[in-house]
């Protein structure tokens, strides 16, 4: 299969490219700039196609260099939760990629989305959901992949524990559970779906093979690795809400404040919402209803990262809790 991958420089996209190449597919990757040595190691065997942006004009100009393809895989995502960026990237750029897929004769369009889109209340979730709907309504075959939580998203407090700081928890109780998945397991799942037309034209959620874990349990795992007694510090959810409300008021006259209010809403969402598939009967998040795949566990990831550091994991919003010198 000849596959075009967008978002190949990202955390998941690079692993998707490596997995597709490993399986013998011909892979073309859209890049804004030539890859550095680290990225190039993941893209070995793929053919790069440089384009300054993923807008319609730039993609149309690149179509001749790309050539015909059997499938397009989109791993693009906004790098922040800013509403304007989310709609520009998660919606508009994906729409441009969908039009390019038709131009290139692709039979299939695979979208890397996110499980949180099952209840879209934030701007970036609504942008993703709007494109999911557009893709489902398009004439091309499709698959929409909704992973739970990435290991790297749960790595932000490792350095806090290493530097004798308490593990931060929001609100009371153990916190919302998730069934996280590694980048390699997710890449394998996406490649499996791409090769199996029985799984096309569906929205497929997946987590990793391990059990559902809460923030409190993740903290206990890290303190055990450190050989230290557990120490937790709780941040009141009322504080997050009040910050968001204050910024929302100021956001009527300030774009920066409006973005800050959205970040507060994002923090509140992830502090309270389990990343689990909703049970079809009750509608409530359910570990039992969450599909699983792969081999990598969070415990193994934490143990390896504790020994070797966060190589390749210091990405995006996971930096929220990272220690800065």
Give the role of each language-model region.
Residues 35-104, 116-118:
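NAD(P)H-binding glycine-rich loop region in Rossmannoid oxidoreductase-like domains
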């Amino acid at each position: 299969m000849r596959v075009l991958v967008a978002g190949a420089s990202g955390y998941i996209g690079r692993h998707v490219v490596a997995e597709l190449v490993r399986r013998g597919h011909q892979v073309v990757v859209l890049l804004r700039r030539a890859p550095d040595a680290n990225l190039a190691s993941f893209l070995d065997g793929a053919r790069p196609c440089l384009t300054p942006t993923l807008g319609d004009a730039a993609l149309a100009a690149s179509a001749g260099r790309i050539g015909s393809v059997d499938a397009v895989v989109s791993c693009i995502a906004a790098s922040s939760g800013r509403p304007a960026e989310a709609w520009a990237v998660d919606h508009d750029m994906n729409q441009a990629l969908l039009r390019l897929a038709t131009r290139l004769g692709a039979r299939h369009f695979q979208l890397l989305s996110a499980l949180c889109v099952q209840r879209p209340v934030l701007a970036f979730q609504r942008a993703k959901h709007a494109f999911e709907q557009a893709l489902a309504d398009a004439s091309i075959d499709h698959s929409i992949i909704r992973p739970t939580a990435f290991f790297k998203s749960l790595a932000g407090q490792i350095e806090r524990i290493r530097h004798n700081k308490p593990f931060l928890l929001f609100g009371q109780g153990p916190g919302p559970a998730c069934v996280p998945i590694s980048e390699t397991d997710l890449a394998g799942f996406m490649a499996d779906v791409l090769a199996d037309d029985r799984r096309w034209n569906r929205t497929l959620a997946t987590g990793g093979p391990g059990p559902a874990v809460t923030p409190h349990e993740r903290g206990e795992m890290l303190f055990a690795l450190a050989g230290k007694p557990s120490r937790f510090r709780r941040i009141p959810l009322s504080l997050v809400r009040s910050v968001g409300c204050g910024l929302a008021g100021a956001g009527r006259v300030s774009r920066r404040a409006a973005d800050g209010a959205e970040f507060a809403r994002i923090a509140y969402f992830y502090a309270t919402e389990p990343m689990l598939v909703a049970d079809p009967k009750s509608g409530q998040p359910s570990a039992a209803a969450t599909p699983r795949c792969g081999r990598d566990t969070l415990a193994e990831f934490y143990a390896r990262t504790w020994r070797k550091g966060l190589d390749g994991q210091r990405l995006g919003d996971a930096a929220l809790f990272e220690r800065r010198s």
